[in-house]
Amino acid sequence: MSCVCRQSIMATMAELQKRSIPEIAAKLEQPFSMVDVALVGDILISVYICQGMVDWHRHLDIDELFWVYEGAILLESEWGEVRLQEGELAVAPKGVGHRSGSEMRASVLLLRCGVIPERKNGRRRLYAIAGEERLKRVNLHIAAQSVALPFQFQTVARVEDSVLQVAWGEGTWSVEIPSPDNLFLFVLNGTATVRTTESMLHLHPGDFTIVPEGEVYQLSTTRDTTLVRMAREM
């Protein structure tokens, strides 16, 4: 089975806009319907409904990161299988056959290269690294607990030349150096306020925003807040 329907709600974000993953997922009615929600550098972020099982397939040119927001899925591959629960993710590397499925409805974020690979700039891994040969499951909550210091983003996964990172902290974070590309900020737990020179947003669990490229921004968070960030690796 392939995706029944694919949509896009991406917009050019000159200023901060709040988006909600549960609200987006609630509007997807059919199994394997999908909506593109953001383009961060070269990485396209989509939300899809996993219910049933897709056919086996492989992508010769792109990695795919599966991040379960709600529910649970089985990700099968030529490297074995992993069961992903809410807040867990795994990367199916380029060239590795795989498929995803779930008996019950699950909301999943899918991250992969959104531009033609031949037109990409910068570093690219052209094939799966020998010796890996297994899917690695990452629990974002556990990964955040392993970060020793507050306000320090730590990389937990890579997709092409971009990194997915987690951090925790309470209070005001240091002002971030402007990024040459836009970046994705997601609230896993707690509440975060994002400020730029143009706007301010309050984000709650399941909310995300895109910080425009070159924008100076600052975060402030409440107790027990965990954030997820995706940006191009510097």
Question: What label would you give each PLM region?
Answer:
Residues 32-33, 51, 61, 93-95, ...:
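Short beta-strand-initiation
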Residues 94-123, 204-205, 213-234:
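Ligand-binding loop in jelly-roll beta-barrel domains
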Residues 41, 69-70, 85-86, 104, ...:
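A cytosolic small-molecule/anion-sensing beta-strand core signal
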Residues 78-95, 197-214:
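Short acidic-glycine-tyrosine-enriched beta hairpin
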Residues 49-51, 58-77, 111, 168-170, ...:
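Short, conserved beta-strand element in jelly-roll/cupin
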Residues 2-46, 118-166:
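A short, N-terminal "cap"/entry segment at the start of jelly-roll beta-barrel domains
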